[in-house]
Amino acid sequence: MQVLRLQPEDTITLFNGRNGEWAATILRMGRANVAVRVEQHHAIEREAPLEVHLAVGMPANERMDWLVEKAVELGAASIQPLLAERSVLRLSADRALKKQMHWQGIAIAACEQCGRNRLPPVHAARPLQDFQAWHQSSVQRRFVLSLDTDSQPLSRVLMSQEFEGPVLLLSGPEGGLSPAEEKAALATGFHALSLGPRTLRAETAPLAALAALTLQAFN
């Protein structure tokens, strides 16, 4: 409110992260709270036609914050942070919970910024091996981002497939997934996907794939 320099009688848009949004008028403003008059509900839907879930090996430092923010803006349906063999970032149970709350807050702010009114969940970090045993069997199209030269190029996948159901994208941390982790993913129904000959950062690769899939769905 302060950043936008809003005043009483100004109109704002409210959303609850689930079902549309509401027009509202500011009645009064305090240091820590705002009173509003909630008015008309608008059943506006801004989700992408394709549901893309991200399972990402967490990059270190603030790069994960940036990944969450941009993934939400690009339309990720959910984000699952993963601890892989080559992960630099290691979290205790207590710190993992605090990080989850922090990342969910970033997701809320990203929704506010881009006008998205459905809030995607950012799940608690979990070991990759646990995720591979648990992954959503209802997601039929599962891809793991790979540096293997035999991997299918994303461009070919986009041209050859109709994406009607949800998609799950798995990517590694700095250094990528280990050979054993990638082999385990392929054994559980993932297909290896290439983003080209260059080595992308851990936070760049899933966002590039997400953006390409989302644009294809909108077209």
What name fits each language-model region?
Residues M1-A43, D94:
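N-terminal positively charged helical leader segments and presequences
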Residues Q7, A77, H191:
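Short acidic/polar active-site loop segments enriched in Thr and Asp
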Residues I12, V36, L119-H123, A192:
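Generic structural signal for residues in well-ordered beta-strands
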Residues G17-R18, M58, A125, S146-D148, ...:
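Fold-independent oxyanion-binding glycine-rich loops
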Residues E39, E45-V144:
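RNA substrate-binding interface of SAM-dependent RNA methyltransferases
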Residues S137-S138, R142-E182, F190-S194:
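Active-site/ligand-binding-proximal alpha/beta "capping" segment
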Residues P179-N219:
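Structured adenosyl-cofactor binding patch, chiefly the S-adenosyl-L-methionine
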